């Protein structure tokens, strides 16, 4: 169990640019320039993790594979890679970047047998992204329903999934605060570590998530709040270190 909350600043890549979306919806992006520059800036600011997402791969609108590999390769810190990892080819490409772990999303919902095999083969290098609206999972860039959250959790627990990245889609990119109840419920349903994603808007939000560390929350992905300059990464790291 984590002793303090890990923070994972996010770099989401769409069409070669670092962007942020609202509710994860295509067409709502705000561009923030070079993904490599953004990633290096978070590293310089003291990040121990980077959450790196290929949005084109997630939405099925192409990919930024070469750029993602370049960014991951330039990092001296740990990298969690996400977006469109749903078969042997995309998984091999993701792992070849040297990232610390990969997040499976849609694939986990559409090809459960493959996910079970990958978890068995790669263990701690695999996390499963649980993108939730209510208690329903959403797949493929959040445009399709993918089953019940708790039934899926039960299955993945039994298959030995090492960790979960939990996103409340209703909160993501909105700066409206995290869904603490969802995080508590997921922690109650699994003994694996949970990484929170979506809605962080303030240092108080991060402190509230940090208070869930004893329940099993290990980390928090922070995106729009950092880019919108609601607080600095240094301030965030200090807030959760206490």
From Swiss-Prot:
Keyword Cytoplasm applies: yes
Principal location class: cytoplasm
Pathway membership: Amino-acid biosynthesis; L-histidine biosynthesis; L-histidine from 5-phospho-alpha-D-ribose 1-diphosphate: step 4/9; Amino-acid biosynthesis; L-tryptophan biosynthesis; L-tryptophan from chorismate: step 3/5
EC number: 5.3.1.16, 5.3.1.24
Molecular function as annotated in GO: 1-(5-phosphoribosyl)-5-[(5-phosphoribosylamino)methylideneamino]imidazole-4-carboxamide isomerase activity; phosphoribosylanthranilate isomerase activity
Gene Ontology cellular component terms for the protein in this record: cytoplasm
Cellular localisation: Cytoplasm
Top-level taxon: Bacteria
Catalytic activity: 1-(5-phospho-beta-D-ribosyl)-5-[(5-phospho-beta-D-ribosylamino)methylideneamino]imidazole-4-carboxamide = 5-[(5-phospho-1-deoxy-D-ribulos-1-ylimino)methylamino]-1-(5-phospho-beta-D-ribosyl)imidazole-4-carboxamide; N-(5-phospho-beta-D-ribosyl)anthranilate = 1-(2-carboxyphenylamino)-1-deoxy-D-ribulose 5-phosphate
CDD domains, alphabetized: HisA
Gene Ontology biological-process annotations: L-histidine biosynthetic process; L-tryptophan biosynthetic process
Database matches in HAMAP family: HisA (MF_01014)
Protein's recorded name: Phosphoribosyl isomerase A
Species of the source: Streptomyces avermitilis (strain ATCC 31267 / DSM 46492 / JCM 5070 / NBRC 14893 / NCIMB 12804 / NRRL 8165 / MA-4680)
Taxonomic path: Bacteria, Bacillati, Actinomycetota, Actinomycetes, Kitasatosporales
Chain's gene name: priA
